[in-house]
A protein has these predicted regions:
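Conserved hydrophobic/aromatic beta-strand scaffold that supports enzyme active sites
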Residues: 8-10, 31, 47, 55-57, ...
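Ligand-binding loop in jelly-roll beta-barrel domains
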Residues: 40, 60-85
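Extracellular/periplasmic catalytic domains that process cell-envelope and extracellular macromolecules
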Residues: 25-26, 33, 69-73
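Glycine- and acidic-residue-biased ligand/ion/polar-headgroup-sensing regions
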Residues: 27-44, 54
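Histidine-centered metal-chelating micro-motifs
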Residues: 18-20, 24, 56, 60-67
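A short, N-terminal "cap"/entry segment at the start of jelly-roll beta-barrel domains
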Residues: 1-7, 49, 56-57, 85
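Short acidic-glycine-tyrosine-enriched beta hairpin
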Residues: 13-14, 44-62
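A short glycine-rich, His/Asp/Glu-containing loop-to-beta-strand
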Residues: 1-22, 74, 79-82
């Protein structure tokens, strides 16, 4: 895919932290894998908790924000396809 690159990032969410604001994934599809802890994904008015293992896909229809409601750090690996800078 000319002009694009595969990006992999690791995020650590401290207990009580929020990853926002509300954002979308138009133009940068991806997926998330949870390594440790629990992350709550908020989309379409629904909060879904994900623990260690496969998380969620992110596509052109994804608009969401995330938080760690737990008492321990949550760690995720996020992989997406982005336009090359």
């Amino acid at each position: 895919m000319a002009g694009y690159e595969l990006r992999m990032r690791r995020f650590t969410f401290a207990p009580g932290s929020v990853f926002g604001p509300l954002h979308d994934h138009r133009g940068r599809p991806g997926l998330v894998y949870i390594l440790e802890g629990t992350i709550t994904d908020h989309r379409d008015g629904i909060a879904t908790e994900y623990g260690p293992g496969p998380g969620w896909p992110e596509d052109r229809n994804t608009t969401h924000w995330l938080e760690n409601r737990g008492t321990v750090p949550a760690i995720e690996v996020s992989v997406d396809i982005v336009r090359r800078a």
